[in-house]
Amino acid sequence: MELTPREKDKLLLFTAALLAERRLARGLKLNYPESVALISAFIMEGARDGKSVAALMEEGRHVLSREQVMEGIPEMIPDIQVEATFPDGSKLVTVHNPII
């Protein structure tokens, strides 16, 4: 199976998000890469489901809370930008202050 670099990036992001979900389920606090991966995967899956950019910008702020991440992580992530594939093409989704 041949994958493009973009497809490889998506698979890596999905794998990191899956790991983050498992760690959250065990009661662990997420670090920076896990937090970014989980929110990014949420946005990409929402785009695939047909949600609007505006809806994902708002919903992306409620994926994680401060209590679910390590100390200092919310300040390290002022915004997250994800190029997601929507039914009508690729669009850039920006989530400001994603961990509240």
Curated annotation (Swiss-Prot):
Q: What is the lineage of its organism?
A: Bacteria, Pseudomonadati, Pseudomonadota, Gammaproteobacteria, Enterobacterales
Species, as recorded: Escherichia coli O157:H7
Instruction: Quote the NCBIfam families the UniProt record gives.
Output: PRK13241.1 (NF009712), urease_gam (TIGR00193)
Protein's pathway: Nitrogen metabolism; urea degradation; CO(2) and NH(3) from urea (urease route): step 1/1
What family does this belong to? Belongs to the urease gamma subunit family.
Q: This chain belongs to which protein, by name?
A: Urease subunit gamma
Q: Which domain of life is it from?
A: Bacteria
Q: Does the keyword Hydrolase apply?
A: yes
- What's the main place this protein lives? cytoplasm
GO CC terms: cytoplasm
Known EC number: 3.5.1.5
- State the oligomer form and interacting partners: Heterotrimer of UreA (gamma), UreB (beta) and UreC (alpha) subunits. Three heterotrimers associate to form the active enzyme.
Q: Catalytic activity, per the record? A: urea + 2 H2O + H(+) = hydrogencarbonate + 2 NH4(+)
Q: Biological process GO terms, please? A: urea catabolic process
Q: Which CDD domains match?
A: Urease_gamma
GO MF term list:
nickel cation binding; urease activity
The UniProt keywords, alphabetically, are: Cytoplasm, Hydrolase
Q: Which top EC class applies here?
A: hydrolase
PANTHER family listed in its UniProt record: UREASE
Q: Where in the cell is it found?
A: Cytoplasm
This protein's record includes keyword Phosphoprotein? no
